[in-house]
Amino acid sequence: MKEKIAYLGMGIWGFCLASLLAHKGYRVVGWARNPELVAQLQTEHRHPQAPDMPIHPNLSFTTDMVEAVDGASMIVEAVSSAGIRPVSKQLKTITDLKVPFVITSKGIEQHTGLLLSEIVVEIFGSQASRYLGYLSGPSIAREVLKGCPCSVVISAYDPDTLKKIHHAFLTPKFRVYPNSDLKGVALGGALKNIIAIACGISDGFQFGDNAKSGLVTRGLHEIRKFATIMDCRPDTLYGLAGLGDLCTTCFSSLSRNTRFGKLIAQGFTLEQAKAEIGMVVEGAYTALSAYQIAKHHKIDMPITTGIYRVLYENLDIKEGIAALLQRNTKEEYL
């Protein structure tokens, strides 16, 4: 019998990785709350956001979480960062988490400032840490679905858990590199979305590639400072989970965070831009948490602060840009 993997969350990213695992020969059961989405997947055998990609026969769908996780040797999540707490609470009523649990979402919880892995540990208890894994890196879902080469990192606290997850996801075209700095991997994936919004704003004003490269470089500097204060390894941020993911998200026309920033530059409000994108914009969610944490720890993060103020304090976007451009320049160091 084929080894079973449960996949929680069937947005385009969840569908993408669930399809990858199905093609590797696993029996994958994808769970989603939305009964209409599940019915569409079951009857049309296409995902609405990837209608040109047929569903692999090893991949099935359900709205019943018990059915999804029963007998699974691994559980993978791809819900929004705002959704991981309620989904984890629901999962806790079903299992005590005795198999690898892989987080593939990117964000920081608002108001608590917790990483997604920390939310899971809070709900399941400290013993859950040994089963936690985190997959992150430059991975646009549509490119992965098409079979384009891609490199990501997987991190876990426990060596056996890391080995199992690494084996499950690795393919000749989906290159998976182990990394022991789980917190750094998580922060790199979360914070780069804020910088991507700034790059989208730059695109919206047609500031050009020079300006965008400056934002990416200074944005990486902000991310590194933040992660260092949070006891992460700085070198993690120069790898796939940091610089790699940052470049892809900031320069890809498929990035929803960059497209969101472009809409903000065009005069859309926060809610209008989110509605126009039609999918979760994690950078908008994370900007609030990152700003609050940076303020508490007195971390100077001018790009993050500017995005927060534009989105949540109604700062005029041109004033925000002017404030960034008028800052004193200091000796560059990374």
Swiss-Prot record:
Keyword Oxidoreductase tagged: yes
Main location: cytoplasm
Membrane-spanning ranges: none
Pathway named in the protein's UniProt entry: Membrane lipid metabolism; glycerophospholipid metabolism
Organism domain of life: Bacteria
Reactions that this protein is recorded to catalyse: sn-glycerol 3-phosphate + NAD(+) = dihydroxyacetone phosphate + NADH + H(+); sn-glycerol 3-phosphate + NADP(+) = dihydroxyacetone phosphate + NADPH + H(+)
EC number of this enzyme: 1.1.1.94
Keywords per UniProt: Cytoplasm, Lipid biosynthesis, Lipid metabolism, NAD, NADP, Nucleotide-binding, Oxidoreductase, Phospholipid biosynthesis, Phospholipid metabolism
Amino-acid positions noted as binding NADPH in the UniProt annotation, renumbered to this chain: W13, R33, K106, A141, R256, V280, E282
InterPro entries linked: 6-PGluconate_DH-like_C_sf (IPR008927), 6PGD_dom2 (IPR013328), G3P_DH_NAD-dep (IPR006168), G3P_DH_NAD-dep_C (IPR006109), G3P_DH_NAD-dep_N (IPR011128), NAD(P)-bd_dom_sf (IPR036291)
Any coiled-coil regions, as ranges: none
Any one GO cellular component localisation term in the record: cytosol
UniProt key word RNA-binding: no
Active-site residues, record numbering mapped to chain: K192
GO biological process, one term: phospholipid biosynthetic process
Entry binding sites for sn-glycerol 3-phosphate: K106, G137, S139, K192, D245, S255, R256, N257
Cellular localisation: Cytoplasm
Any one GO molecular function term: NAD binding
Family affiliation: Belongs to the NAD-dependent glycerol-3-phosphate dehydrogenase family.
Biological function: Catalyzes the reduction of the glycolytic intermediate dihydroxyacetone phosphate (DHAP) to sn-glycerol 3-phosphate (G3P), the key precursor for phospholipid synthesis.
UniProt protein name: Glycerol-3-phosphate dehydrogenase [NAD(P)+]
Gene: gpsA
